[in-house]
């Protein structure tokens, strides 16, 4: 597609193969915002290699068939990760809040995820290049996050009180090792990092939203419950206390 994708090194031969693959989204495993506010992506190179092998088999079978139709990668079924490359829209209806007489705000969940950034499918394949550029643009992602949290008037992502949200931490890709990238989501790694799983969630857990530009906002342990099933996760408040992470963070969950 002629694009150097986020998080990839064009000087590496294996990663060049992914960059120029017909369907690079087959290797896409999720995006997240790191503690510095930078958008990063997780790639599994084996995914695109398997996709290319499947494409080659399909083309070979079509070439030996009696039909005159020429098979290409475009004739393959749509890959489930293709939607992750479309420009996203914010599902504001998945989060509602009600204020009690005491002034405290309680969350009323109508979706498994709060502030969900969900894919919006495009109808024309020729729009994929532009939408991919937009999605991988850190400014575009930050704008979507600010819109999700009702702070689109600000130049920096701003926090909502953690007690009104459902902070979660982890990943289901199984190939991220550091704490900030999702390590510690299993029982063994949680014990190693002195982290105790407090909830479970399904789907992608893809990042954090910096609390303020200076990163000095304190976190809170008053976390809303999450009743989903899936990978073990660690609450943000618990993580901040035990891993000595100074600023409070809210992890955003995406479901492919």
UniProtKB/Swiss-Prot annotation:
Region (Disordered): 56-115, 149-235
Bias-annotated ranges (Low complexity): 56-72, 155-179, 211-222
Taxonomic superkingdom: Bacteria
Bias type Polar residues, positions: 96-112
InterPro entries: Adhesin_P1_C
Stated family: Belongs to the adhesin P1 family.
Protein name: Putative adhesin P1-like protein MPN_132
């Amino acid at each position: 597609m002629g694009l150097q994708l986020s998080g990839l090194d064009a000087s590496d031969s294996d990663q060049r193969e992914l960059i120029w693959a017909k369907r690079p989204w087959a290797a896409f495993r999720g995006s997240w915002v790191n503690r510095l506010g930078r958008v990063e992506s997780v790639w599994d190179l084996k995914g695109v290699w398997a996709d290319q092998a499947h494409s080659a088999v399909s083309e070979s079978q079509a070439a030996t068939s009696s039909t005159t139709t020429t098979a290409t990668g475009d004739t393959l079924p749509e890959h489930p990760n293709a939607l992750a490359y479309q420009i996203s829209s914010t599902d504001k209806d998945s989060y509602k809040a009600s204020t009690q007489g005491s002034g405290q705000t309680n969350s009323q969940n109508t979706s498994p995820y709060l502030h969900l950034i969900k894919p919006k499918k495009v109808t024309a394949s020729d729009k994929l290049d532009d939408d991919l550029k937009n999605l991988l643009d850190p400014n575009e992602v930050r704008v979507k996050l600010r819109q999700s949290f009702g702070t689109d008037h600000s130049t920096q992502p701003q926090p909502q009180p953690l007690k009104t949200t459902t902070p979660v931490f982890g990943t289901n890709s199984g190939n991220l090792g550091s704490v900030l990238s999702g390590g510690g989501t299993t029982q063994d790694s949680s014990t190693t990092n002195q982290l105790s799983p407090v909830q479970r969630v399904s789907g992608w857990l893809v990042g954090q939203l910096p609390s303020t530009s200076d990163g000095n906002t304190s976190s809170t342990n008053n976390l809303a419950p999450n009743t989903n099933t899936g990978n073990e996760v660690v609450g943000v408040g618990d993580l901040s206390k035990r891993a000595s992470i100074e600023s409070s963070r809210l992890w955003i969950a995406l479901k492919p």
